[in-house]
Design a protein with these regions (language model features):
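Secretory targeting and sorting signals
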Residues: 1-33
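C-terminal and inter-domain tail/linker signature
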Residues: 28-324
C-alpha cells in the first residue's frame, strides 16, 4: 500500500541513495559463515568451485544458503570492511539497480571501502529475510549515525550459480512520528516473530496477496480490503492510520487525489506467511513515479499486517538499468 496523498516521498540524500547494497543483518558473523557453509558445502570461497550450482542440496537448503550469503556479503562489506566477501560471493558482472551506484563487483568494493571510512559506526538491523526461487529480500533499519532514526530499506538480490548476480533496493527516511502509532519495522500480529511461517503456506499466501494487489492497487478497488484483510490489521506505513478503517480512509484519499495513478507490480517474493510485492507506481502521467515494496503478513487466510518502503525514482542513474 502506498502513502496518503498529503505526503510526497522525498528522494534520499545522495550519500544514502548511492548504497550499492543497503542492508546488513544483525546476525553473528560466525553463525552466518557456518550457515552458508552447512547449507551449501560448495559455497563460493568455501572449498568448492566458484559459481558452483546449488542443485542437489534440496530447496530448503538452497534458500537458507541464499539468505545466509546475502547477509554475509552485507555484513562483510558494510560492518567489517571485508571486501574479500565480494570476491567470494558476488559475480564480477553484478547488475546494480540502485540509481546512484555503478554496475559491477569492483564498484561495490570501492563503495564499501568509502562507506566504512565515512560511517564507521553505522548499524544495520535486519528485521526479516525471505527467499523464494533465486531471490532474497531483506527488510532493515539502517542507521548511519548512532542516535538517529535512520532509514527503512528493502534489498532484493538475485542469485545465479550460488553467487549474487543482481540487486534492487528501495530506501525511505524514517519519520519522527506516524499516523498509526506503530514503527516501520516491528511485528505486532501474533505470533510476534520476524521469521516467515511454514513453507507449505508459501504458494497459497502468494496467490492471495497477488490477487489482493491486483484489485486494491492496480484496479484501485477498495472493496478488496473487505475480502482479503483481517479485522485486526496492523499498519506500518507511517502516513496511514491503523486498522481496516484507516486503510480504507488513507487509500481512498490517495486514489481521489491521483485518479490517474498507474501501479505496475514487477515481482512478488513469498516465504511462509510473508509476501513482498515490488512495484512501480506513477501518480500522474509523465512523471517518473516511485519504487515501492509492500510487505504483507498473512495469517489464517487473511492479511493481518503491512509494512512498506517508498522511494522517488530519480531523473538520472549511475548505471544503465532502471530501478525495476
Amino acid at each position: 500500500m502506498n502513502t496518503t496523498a498529503s505526503v510526497r516521498r522525498r528522494t534520499l540524500a545522495a550519500a544514502i541513495a548511492a548504497l550499492a547494497l543497503t542492508t546488513v543483518g544483525a546476525v553473528p558473523a560466525a553463525a552466518v559463515d557456518s550457515s552458508a557453509s552447512a547449507a551449501h558445502p560448495q559455497a563460493p570461497g568455501r572449498g568448492g568451485a566458484p559459481g558452483s550450482s546449488t542443485a542437489g542440496y534440496g530447496e530448503n537448503a538452497r534458500l537458507a544458503y541464499q539468505k545466509a550469503v546475502a547477509v554475509q556479503v552485507l555484513r562483510g562489506v558494510f560492518e567489517r570492511g571485508d571486501m574479500t566477501v565480494v570476491d567470494r560471493f558476488v559475480r564480477p558482472d553484478y547488475i546494480q539497480h540502485n540509481p546512484l551506484a555503478p554496475d559491477g563487483a569492483a564498484a561495490l568494493k570501492a563503495f564499501g571501502t568509502a562507506w566504512r571510512q565515512q560511517y564507521p559506526d553505522a548499524t544495520y538491523d535486519i528485521k526479516r529475510v525471505i527467499s523464494e526461487g533465486d531471490l532474497v529480500l531483506l527488510h532493515s533499519n539502517v542507521v548511519l549515525t548512532p542516535g538517529t532514526r535512520g532509514i527503512a530499506a528493502v534489498d532484493i538480490f538475485r542469485f545465479q550459480g550460488g553467487k549474487v548476480a543482481e540487486h534492487w533496493d528501495v530506501l525511505q527516511d524514517v519519520p519522527a512520528t506516524t499516523a498509526n502509532g506503530n514503527d516501520m519495522f516491528s511485528t505486532i500480529s501474533r505470533p510476534q516473530t520476524e521469521a516467515p511461517g511454514p513453507a507449505y503456506l508459501t504458494a497459497y499466501n502468494k496467490k492471495l496477496v497477488t490477487a489482493f494487489v491486483e484489485r486494491y492497487l492496480v484496479k484501485k478497488d477498495l472493496s478488496a480490503i473487505d475480502t482479503y484483510v483481517g479485522p485486526e490489521y496492523h499498519q506500518h506505513n507511517p502516513y496511514i492510520p491503523d486498522g481496516v478503517a484507516g486503510a480504507k480512509a488513507g487509500l481512498g484519499a490517495y486514489y481521489a487525489q491521483f485518479p490517474q495513478l498507474v501501479a505496475t507490480p514487477k515481482r512478488v517474493i513469498a516465504e511462509g506467511d510473508l509476501v513482498a510485492v515490488h512495484s512501480h507506481t506513477v501518480n500522474v502521467p509523465g512523471e517518473r513515479g516511485q519504487a515501492v515494496v509492500d510487505l504483507f503478513r498473512v495469517r489464517n487466510g487473511r492479511i493481518v499486517e503491512h509494512w512498506d518502503v517508498v522511494q522517488d525514482v530519480p531523473e538520472t542513474s549511475a548505471n544503465d538499468n532502471t530501478m525495476f
